[in-house]
C-alpha cells in the first residue's frame, strides 16, 4: 500500500478522507475494507460460493428428473426444497449481487473518475449485511425440517401452512428473514451507486459521456430501489402470517377437515406484491448485462457504439416499462380478461426498446474490425441467446398461448434462457474482459475458449429440448413423471439427455474456476490496457488500481466513451482523458 500525503499533490481534504476511510492495517484493508474494489471482490466471491450451492442443487434435481426412482434420498419434499433454494439463490443472491454488488462496486467509481464510492463506510456495511443474509439462508439447510419447499416464488397458502413442504416452521422463517436482510443491505449499497453516478463524476464526465455499463447499472439500481420495497413488505407480512397468526395472505381454509385459525387474507395480494418486484428483477439483472455487452462489442469490434443516445433511452425506457407488465405472470390466477389484454399489450411494447438495442449491437458490428476474443465470443453468444429467449417470451406474453403453456417445461426453458443463460454469459464475458484490470494478468486463452464452447453449446443442448418437452405438455414442478400417459418414452429419453448435459456444463465451470485461480499467479502479464479500450478504468496509473484509483490527480474527461477508429489519431482508439481533436467528432450531440 502506497502512503498518500498532501506532498503528493492530492488536496489535504481528500487525503484526510481517504485515510479516515481506509486505515492501513491488513485487517481493515482486506476484510473490513471500505475500498469499493475490495468490496466488489468480496461480493463476487460470496455470490460465486452460494452460486455453486445452487449448481449442486440443480444437479440433484436433474438426477431425479432424468433418472426417476433411482435416488431414494431425493424425496418429493427434498425435491421441492431444492427447487426453492436453487431459484432464490440464482435470481437474488447470485445474479443481483454479482451485477450490482460486484461489477457495480468495481466499475462505477473507476468509470466515472471517482476515488471511491461517495459513502465508503455504508458500502462496507452493505456487503456484511449481504453476507449475513446468505448465512441465514444457508442455515435453513440445517434447521429442523430443512429449508422451505414453497417454490422460489413463495406462494401462499403453501408457504405459510404448517406441515407442508413450503411451511416448514424454521425453513420459511429463515428464508423470509434472509430476504429482508438482503433488501436492507442492497438499499444501503444501491443508494451509494446512485449518488456516486450523480454526484461523484469527475470533471468533464457528463451524463452523456458515461459508458453504457454505468447507465445499465445505474438504471437497474434505481429500479431495484423502487421494486424491492414491494418484496420487503410482502416478506414482513408473510412472516407475521407464519409467526404471529395474522391473515394478510391466508384465506379462510380447512386442512384435513379442520378450520385453520386464519381468515380474510388474499393469496393473490402476495402474487401482486411479489411480481411487482419480480418482473423488474428480470431487468435489474438484464440492464447491467445490456450495458456490459455494449462496451464489450464496441471495444472488441474497434468501432463506436451505434446510436449511443438511443441506447441510453432504450435502457431507461425498458426500466420504466418493466413496472407495468408484472401481471403477465398471473394470467392463470383468475384475472379479468380486460386486464389480461392490458398486460399482454404492455408486454409486447417492451419488446420495442429491447429490439432497438439488438439492432444497434448488430449495426455496431457491421463493418467493424471484429476481434473474436473470449469476451467478444461471450457477448455475441449473449445476443443470440437473449433474442432466442425473447422470442419465446412473445409467445408467453400472449394470454391465449400462455394459459396452456403456463405450467409446462416451456416456461422453465424460456425463463432459464432469458434469466439464467443469457446473464451468466455476460458475467463470464465481463470477467474475461476486466480480469486483467483486477489482477494485472490475463486468463489462459485455451482454457477460456474451451470454457466458452462447453458452456454455450451445452446450455443450448439443455434448454432447447426443454421447449419441446413443454410443447408436448410435460408439466413442471413434478418430482417424478413415470406414467406414460403423461410423458412418452421419447420424452423420458430427452429428460435423461438433458440431465447428462447439465452435468457436463457444470463440470466445465470447474475448468473456469481453475483458470480464474491459476492465472492470478501464472497468467501472462496484461499491462495497463490490454484491450486498447477508451474508458477511464483502463487509464489508471497502476494495475490493479491502488486505493484512490487515479493517483494524485483525478482525470479530466474530454470526449465520450467510444472514440474508436478516429481519423488522424495515432492509434485506433482515443481514451476519454486525452484532449485534442482528431477529425470530425463522433460524440453524440
Locations of the language-model features?
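Membrane-embedded and interfacial regions of multi-pass energy-transducing membrane proteins
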Residues: 2-589
Amino acid at each position: 500500500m502506497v502512503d498518500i500525503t498532501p506532498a503528493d499533490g492530492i488536496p489535504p481534504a481528500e487525503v484526510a478522507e481517504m485515510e479516515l476511510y481506509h486505515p492501513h492495517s491488513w485487517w481493515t484493508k482486506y476484510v473490513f475494507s471500505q475500498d469499493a474494489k475490495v468490496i466488489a471482490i468480496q461480493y463476487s466471491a460470496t455470490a460465486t460460493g452460494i452460486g455453486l450451492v445452487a449448481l449442486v442443487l440443480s444437479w440433484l434435481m436433474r438426477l431425479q428428473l432424468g433418472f426417476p426412482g433411482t435416488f431414494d434420498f431425493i424425496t418429493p419434499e427434498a425435491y421441492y426444497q431444492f427447487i426453492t433454494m436453487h431459484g432464490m439463490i440464482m435470481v437474488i443472491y447470485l445474479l443481483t449481487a454479482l451485477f450490482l454488488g460486484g461489477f457495480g462496486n468495481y466499475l462505477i467509481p473507476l468509470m466515472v473518475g471517482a476515488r471511491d464510492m461517495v459513502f465508503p463506510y455504508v458500502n462496507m456495511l452493505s456487503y456484511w449485511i449481504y453476507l449475513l443474509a446468505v448465512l441465514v439462508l444457508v442455515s435453513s439447510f440445517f434447521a429442523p425440517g430443512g429449508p422451505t419447499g414453497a417454490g422460489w416464488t413463495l406462494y401462499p397458502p403453501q408457504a405459510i401452512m404448517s406441515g407442508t413442504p413450503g411451511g416448514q416452521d424454521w425453513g420459511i422463517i429463515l428464508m423470509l428473514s434472509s430476504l429482508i436482510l438482503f433488501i436492507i443491505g442492497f438499499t444501503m449499497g444501491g443508494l451509494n451507486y446512485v449518488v456516486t453516478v450523480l454526484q461523484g463524476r469527475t470533471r468533464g464526465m457528463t451524463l452523456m459521456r458515461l459508458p453504457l455499463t454505468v447507465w445499465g447499472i445505474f438504471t437497474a439500481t434505481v429500479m431495484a430501489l423502487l421494486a424491492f420495497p414491494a418484496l420487503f413488505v410482502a416478506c414482513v407480512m408473510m412472516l407475521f402470517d407464519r409467526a404471529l397468526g395474522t391473515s394478510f395472505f391466508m384465506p379462510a381454509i380447512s386442512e384435513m377437515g379442520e378450520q385453520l385459525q386464519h381468515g380474510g387474507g388474499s393469496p393473490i395480494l402476495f402474487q401482486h406484491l411479489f411480481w411487482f418486484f419480480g418482473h423488474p428483477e428480470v431487468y435489474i439483472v438484464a440492464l447491467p448485462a445490456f450495458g456490459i455487452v455494449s462496451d464489450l462489442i464496441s471495444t472488441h469490434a474497434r468501432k463506436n457504439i451505434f446510436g449511443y443516445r438511443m441506447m441510453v433511452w432504450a435502457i431507461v425506457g425498458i426500466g420504466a416499462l418493466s413496472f407495468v407488465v408484472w401481471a403477465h405472470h398471473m394470467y392463470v390466477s383468475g384475472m379479468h380478461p380486460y386486464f389480461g389484454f392490458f398486460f399482454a399489450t404492455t408486454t409486447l411494447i417492451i419488446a420495442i426498446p429491447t429490439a432497438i438495442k439488438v439492432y444497434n449491437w448488430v449495426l455496431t458490428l457491421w463493418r467493424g474490425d471484429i476481434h473474436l476474443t473470449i469476451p467478444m465470443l461471450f457477448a455475441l453468444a449473449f445476443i443470440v441467446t437473449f433474442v432466442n429467449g425473447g422470442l419465446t417470451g412473445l409467445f408467453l406474453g400472449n394470454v391465449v398461448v400462455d394459459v396452456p403453456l403456463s405450467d409446462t417445461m416451456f416456461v422453465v426453458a424460456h425463463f432459464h434462457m432469458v434469466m439464467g443463460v443469457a446473464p451468466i454469459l455476460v458475467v463470464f464475458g465481463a470477467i474475461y474482459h476486466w480480469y486483467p484490470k483486477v489482477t494485472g494478468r490475463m486468463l489462459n486463452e485455451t482454457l477460456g475458449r474451451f470454457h466458452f464452447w462447453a458452456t454455450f453449446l451445452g446450455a443450448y443442448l439443455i434448454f432447447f429440448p426443454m421447449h419441446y418437452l413443454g410443447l408436448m405438455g410435460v408439466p413442471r414442478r413434478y418430482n417424478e413423471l413415470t406414467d406414460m400417459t403423461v410423458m412418452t418414452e421419447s420424452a423420458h429419453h430427452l429428460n435423461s439427455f438433458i440431465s447428462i448435459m447439465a452435468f457436463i456444463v457444470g463440470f466445465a465451470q470447474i475448468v473456469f474456476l481453475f483458470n480464474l485461480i491459476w492465472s492470478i499467479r501464472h497468467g501472462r502479464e496484461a499491462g495497463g490496457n490490454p484491450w486498447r479500450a477508451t474508458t477511464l478504468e483502463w487509464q489508471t496509473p497502476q494495475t490493479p488500481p491502488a486505493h484512490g484509483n487515479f493517483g494524485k490527480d483525478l482525470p479530466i474527461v474530454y470526449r465520450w466513451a467510444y472514440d474508436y477508429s478516429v481519423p488522424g489519431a495515432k492509434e485506433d482508439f482515443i481514451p476519454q482523458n486525452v484532449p485534442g481533436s482528431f477529425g470530425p467528432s463522433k460524440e453524440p450531440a
